[in-house]
């Protein structure tokens, strides 16, 4: 039996600055996640911050994506080592860490995903990520195959973007446009010129440090603009948004 689970192709694609088009999975359903995995996206965020996800709902979704070319990325609810450890043990290799504001917080996220001496990840010899102990080189390979993407979505995060982007082990910078807009005094209006200028600034600083940048952009014009500005991994929609739009359109068609 071939139990090779490395290398991490999504991590390699980010490092090579290859454009990666993704989608948000927020319905906490293995069926909808499986459908997304068949659609051809390069990566999928399984949201543990704003969606009703936890370990018990995420494992079936990971199973649903087995064999899919779409790389699963988990957004953890908070930058907390025990939560991150549990996500590692169930089989996630790609992490989106919300609300990172300082270099110290970025470094803590990285350390949470690394075994000692590089980090503080707790050791279990048999779990889903190492195929229940059947991957002989898991400990040797894991540290260098984890992807850490940190989310900048506050004024303090913007102020510290250079230090955050320079943090060793951080693979990418992701802009949270809604929270960023709120932090800048434009709640509900991520299209405000001040917000857009700040997004462009974050992209530029990430690029200056050789780090790829990404964003959630469910409006096509926004997504294309961000790609033109240098974003390399962009989530262009969500299962919830697509489901709501299609069902509303269907209802409107027959209820006019």
From Swiss-Prot:
Cofactor remark: Binds 1 Mg(2+) ion per subunit.
InterPro entries cross-referenced by the UniProt entry: Aldolase/citrate-lyase_domain, GarL, HpcH-HpaI_aldolase, Pyrv/PenolPyrv_kinase-like_dom, Pyrv_kinase-like_dom_sf
Cofactor: Mg(2+)
Record-given protein name: 5-keto-4-deoxy-D-glucarate aldolase
Pathway per the UniProt entry: Carbohydrate acid metabolism; galactarate degradation; D-glycerate from galactarate: step 2/3
Record-linked NCBIfam families: GarL (TIGR03239), PRK10558.1 (NF007849)
Record key words, sorted: Lyase, Magnesium, Metal-binding
Sites where the protein binds substrate: 151, 178-179
Molecular-function GO terms, alphabetical: 2-dehydro-3-deoxyglucarate aldolase activity; aldehyde-lyase activity; magnesium ion binding
Cellular component terms (Gene Ontology): cytoplasm
Residue(s) at site: Increases basicity of active site His: 89
Similarity comment: family membership: Belongs to the HpcH/HpaI aldolase family. KDGluc aldolase subfamily.
Pfam families registered for this protein in UniProt: HpcH_HpaI
Catalytic activity: 5-dehydro-4-deoxy-D-glucarate = 2-hydroxy-3-oxopropanoate + pyruvate; 2-dehydro-3-deoxy-D-glucarate = 2-hydroxy-3-oxopropanoate + pyruvate
Record-listed E.C. numbers: 4.1.2.20
Biological source species: Salmonella typhimurium (strain LT2 / SGSC1412 / ATCC 700720)
Subunit comment: Homohexamer; trimer of dimers.
GO biological process: D-glucarate catabolic process; galactarate catabolic process
Site positions per UniProt: Transition state stabilizer: 75
Annotated positions binding Mg(2+): 153, 179
């Amino acid at each position: 039996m071939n139990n090779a689970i490395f290398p991490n192709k999504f991590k390699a694609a980010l490092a090579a600055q290859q454009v990666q088009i993704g989608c948000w999975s927020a319905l906490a359903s293995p069926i909808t996640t499986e459908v997304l995995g068949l659609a051809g996206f390069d990566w999928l965020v399984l949201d543990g911050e704003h969606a009703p996800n936890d370990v018990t709902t995420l494992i079936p979704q990971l199973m649903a994506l087995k064999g899919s070319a779409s790389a699963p990325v988990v957004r953890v609810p908070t930058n907390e080592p025990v939560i991150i450890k549990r996500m590692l043990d169930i089989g996630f290799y790609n992490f989106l860490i919300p609300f990172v504001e300082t270099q110290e917080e970025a470094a803590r996220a990285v350390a949470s995903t690394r075994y000692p001496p590089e980090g503080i990840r707790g050791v279990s010899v048999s779990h889903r990520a190492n195929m229940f102990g059947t991957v002989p080189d898991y400990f040797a390979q894991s540290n260098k195959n984890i992807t850490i993407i940190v989310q900048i979505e506050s004024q303090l995060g913007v102020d510290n973007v250079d230090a955050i982007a320079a943090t060793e082990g951080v693979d990418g910078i992701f802009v949270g446009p809604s929270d960023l807009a709120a932090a800048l005094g434009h709640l509900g209006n991520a299209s405000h010129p001040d917000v857009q200028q700040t997004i462009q600034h974050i992209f530029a600083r990430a690029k200056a440090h050789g780090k790829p940048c990404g964003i959630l952009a469910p409006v096509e014009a926004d997504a294309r603009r961000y790609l033109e500005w240098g974003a390399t991994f962009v989530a262009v929609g969500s299962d919830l948004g697509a489901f709501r739009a299609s069902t509303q359109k269907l209802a409107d068609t027959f209820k006019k």
